[in-house]
From Swiss-Prot:
Organism lineage string: Eukaryota, Metazoa, Ecdysozoa, Arthropoda, Hexapoda
Region (Disordered): 152-179
Note: Two isoforms of apolipophorin-3 (a and b) have been found and occur in a ratio of 5a:9b in the hemolymph.
Subunit field text: Equilibrium between a soluble monomer and a bound lipoprotein form. Apolipophorin-3 associates with lipophorin during lipid loading until each particle contains 14 molecules of apolipophorin-3 in L.migratoria (5 molecules of apolipophorin-3a and 9 of apolipophorin-3b).
Entry's family note: Belongs to the insect apolipophorin-3 family.
Presence of keyword Metal-binding: no
Function, in words: Assists in the loading of diacylglycerol, generated from triacylglycerol stores in the fat body through the action of adipokinetic hormone, into lipophorin, the hemolymph lipoprotein. It increases the lipid carrying capacity of lipophorin by covering the expanding hydrophobic surface resulting from diacylglycerol uptake. It thus plays a critical role in the transport of lipids during flight in several species of insects.
Biased composition (Polar residues): 165-179
Protein name: Apolipophorin-3b
Disulfide bond entries: none
One of the protein's GO biological processes: lipid transport
Tissue expression as described in the entry: Hemolymph.
Length: 179
């Protein structure tokens, strides 16, 4: 901490210029140094090609919206499957859809793309297992589960791909050599 303070004091002293009367305005020198540091940080940020906080938030929001759209498609598919089968199968599909939607919502609200992917994969595994074990007639369950499983697999693959793309773009931006 003392070293940092000494460096800052040295920087202020180097930045300070006496006025016509020979006086040094330390506050003005500190303000100029702060301005220089802020400009250097912005230039470094631009040189590395890093997204601004707003851009990063927009990317994550875009990913979350795409994820929610896919979930809506899967939920619609689940409801269509539920309409094909009456009674207990329809009830189980509705419960399955609610559990899936809740699990995916939890995954989509995770802060990190890797966390989203892990939560989604866990949710898909858990909900798929619940569906398969709760069905009293395995042949009906497997028949109803096949299109749902396909849609879930597609959603998982697209989410994994989107998370990987986002992670790669962030890593390449961070690793981009300064010109």
């Amino acid at each position: 901490m003392n070293t940092l303070l000494a460096v800052l004091m040295l920087a202020v002293a180097a930045q300070a210029r006496p006025d016509a009367a020979g006086h040094v305005n330390i506050a003005e020198a500190v303000q100029q140094l702060n301005h220089t540091i802020v400009n250097a940080a912005h230039e470094l940020h631009e040189t590395l090609g890093l997204p601004t906080p707003d851009e990063a938030l927009n990317l994550l929001t875009e990913q979350a919206n795409a994820f929610k759209t896919k979930i809506a498609e899967v939920t619609t598919s689940l409801k269509q499957e539920a309409e094909k089968h009456q009674g207990s199968v329809a009830e189980q599909l509705n419960r399955f859809a609610r559990n899936l939607n809740n699990s995916i919502h939890d995954a989509a609200t995770s802060a990190q793309p890797a966390d989203q992917l892990n939560s989604l994969q866990s949710a898909l595994t858990n909900v798929g297992h619940q569906w398969q074990t709760s069905q009293p007639r395995p042949s009906v369950a497997q028949e109803a589960w096949a299109p749902v499983q396909s849609a879930l697999q597609e959603a998982a693959e697209k989410t994994k791909e989107a998370a990987a793309n986002l992670q790669n773009s962030i890593q390449s931006a961070v690793q981009k050599p300064a010109n």
